[in-house]
Structure formats: structure tokens, C-alpha cells
Amino acid sequence: MIQPQTYLNVADNSGARKLMCIRIIGASNRRYAHIGDVIVAVIKEAIPNTPLERSEVIRAVIVRTCKELKRNNGTIIRYDDNAAVVIDQEGNPKGTRVFGAIPRELRQLNFTKIVSLAPEVL
């Protein structure tokens, strides 16, 4: 469950290291975002000499949350951190690599490019 002011790790090589959620895309008064939701975030920590800079406002899709994800078959998935992948306006990832495990629910939400870059799909 990601809400505004939540810090997230970045799970790609776009140049950002930490993000802070400032808005959840969707309904005007959505309180929480879950895996697969698109958020508006500000970069709080970035690698020097990369295209993304600190205090830049970007869009990102959530790929891991500490809150459990319950599937229809009864299995529950929980990750150790909150993480997101930086995307552009069309939904394509800005980085060329994705780090860590990615849930297969992202494929159903049309983030197939992120799923194809991931080393492991759970």
C-alpha cells in the first residue's frame, strides 16, 4: 500500500535511486496504490551524470510492495521493499534493465516491456 509521501526504491537503471510518491494516477481521491498502479513521484536521490536529476517529477509503476498481494488461487506474495520502475508517458520503461523479481500481474496490465526486462517473474 503506497500513499503520498511514501519513499520507494527504483528497480531499474534509469539513474534515479529513491522516489517519493506525490500522487496516485486513477481516481481523483484514491488513497492507496498497489502493484501495477501508476504514480507521480519526485526523485529524491539520483546517480550523478544521468539524464534524471534530483527533484524531477516523473511517472513510475509500482512493481514491489511490502504489503501482501493476494492472488485468486490463494497464494500470497510479499516483498522486502517498496520499489517502482520509472516510465515515460506511453508506459515504456526509461531504463534498459530491471532489477529484482517482478510479479506476473504486470503482464495483464500491459507492462509487457517491463516483464520482458525482468530477470525473474513470480
Curated annotation (Swiss-Prot):
Its main location: plastid. InterPro entries: Ribosomal_uL14, Ribosomal_uL14_bac-type, Ribosomal_uL14_CS, Ribosomal_uL14_sf. One of its GO terms (biological process) is translation. Keywords: Chloroplast, Plastid, Ribonucleoprotein, Ribosomal protein, RNA-binding, rRNA-binding. It is found in: Plastid, Chloroplast. Gene3D superfamilies: Ribosomal protein L14. The keyword Ion transport does not apply. It comes from the Eukaryota. GO terms for molecular function: large ribosomal subunit rRNA binding; structural constituent of ribosome. GO terms for cellular component: chloroplast; cytosolic large ribosomal subunit. Binds to 23S rRNA. Part of the 50S ribosomal subunit. Belongs to the universal ribosomal protein uL14 family. This is Large ribosomal subunit protein uL14c. It comes from Capsella bursa-pastoris (Shepherd's purse).
